[in-house]
Amino acid sequence: MFERQSNNPEPIEVSDNNPERESTADALLTTRIYISNLDYSSTEDELIEYLKDYKPLSVLVPSHTVRGFRSNHVKPLGIAYADFETPEKAREAVEALNETNFKNRNLKVKLYVPFSPENVCKPAPKPRRLSKLRRSKKPADEENNAASQDPTVEATQERGQASEDPENAANNAKQAKPTSDDTVYCGYLPKNTTDADLREHFKDYNPQEIWIFRTRAAKGPMHLQLHRHYTAALITLNSPETIAKIAEVTSTKKILGKKISVKPAYISKIQEVKKIAEQTGIAERNQTNKGAIKPNSGNGGQPAGPGVAGEPSNPQQNCDNSNNVQPGVSVVA
């Protein structure tokens, strides 16, 4: 037979698992205090004397050992723990000694809270921030036409514009630099390239003035950049063909067995080379040697203009080829 159950069952006890409430209760019942911002020279005996009005049972100053190659030394952590007879004495010490001055430092005194993994505070999630591109406002004309556009097409256009803008900006920056109508830039020339080699390479386009110089390019990240020097030249031509066409044709040919780069020269590069030549006196020396060019120097026997790397009659007047600079211009790009 079944027994009749009582209509008044005993109350069920429900435990409160709130970590914050438990830690607060533990702190109220603890007999230990935690002291921070302590002077590193403080000793346990000095703290016992400082806390004597509250009858501490023990004082602990934690430290750690710093191990060196030849010796070890103990370094305090700047904190201390003190135990008292009752929780009331501990709370009394906290209320009286917090923010008091001890050895020219304001002590931070509070009740000790035992460590528990549940009491560890989790870091708050960082707010998500939109990129500058997504925060940027749409132009007024796009806002006016937003209602009539397909949302899928609009999103595709925005993604395409975001990916193409950096490249287009770089190309526009390059196109903005003006180029010469009669001068080409030859890069990555062989180290021993001479004036005669370049005149032979561009013989179909009547080369006039030639500047051979060294330039420098940096590769790699900023903190590990490797600087590579290479030979380049500026060549002024007298031809009905456009400079772009000449650069396209001559880029397919090799000089001394090496493929080179030929493109229209930037006017700023031409001005830079000539300015350095004027500063170093190269243009004046070439002007002085204008009539000292042999008929077989590669320019049809005509006197060389300023900066033409012809063959002087006096070998001692020729530029130093060890620097790969003819006629003596050294440019660092």
Curated annotation (Swiss-Prot):
Report the GO molecular function annotations. RNA binding
Q: Where is this region: Disordered?
A: 1-22, 123-185, 281-333
According to the UniProt entry, which residue ranges have a biased composition of type Basic residues? 125-137
Keywords associated with the record: Repeat, RNA-binding, Transcription, Transcription regulation
| Residue intervals of the RRM domain | 31-114, 182-267
Q: Highest taxon of the source?
A: Eukaryota
Q: Does the keyword Zinc apply?
A: no
For bias type Polar residues, the affected ranges are 145-160, 169-182, 313-327
Query: Does RNA-binding show up as a keyword for this record?
Result: yes
A Pfam family cross-referenced in the UniProt record is RRM_1
Gly residues: which segments have biased composition? 298-308
PANTHER family this protein is in? EUKARYOTIC TRANSLATION INITIATION FACTOR 4B/4H, NUCLEAR RNA-BINDING PROTEIN SART-3
Give the family, as the similarity comment puts it.
Belongs to the RRT5 family.
Q: What does this protein do?
A: May be involved in the modulation of rDNA transcription.
- Record's protein name: Regulator of rDNA transcription protein 5
Per the UniProt entry, what species is this protein from, by scientific name? Answer: Vanderwaltozyma polyspora (strain ATCC 22028 / DSM 70294 / BCRC 21397 / CBS 2163 / NBRC 10782 / NRRL Y-8283 / UCD 57-17) (Kluyveromyces polysporus)
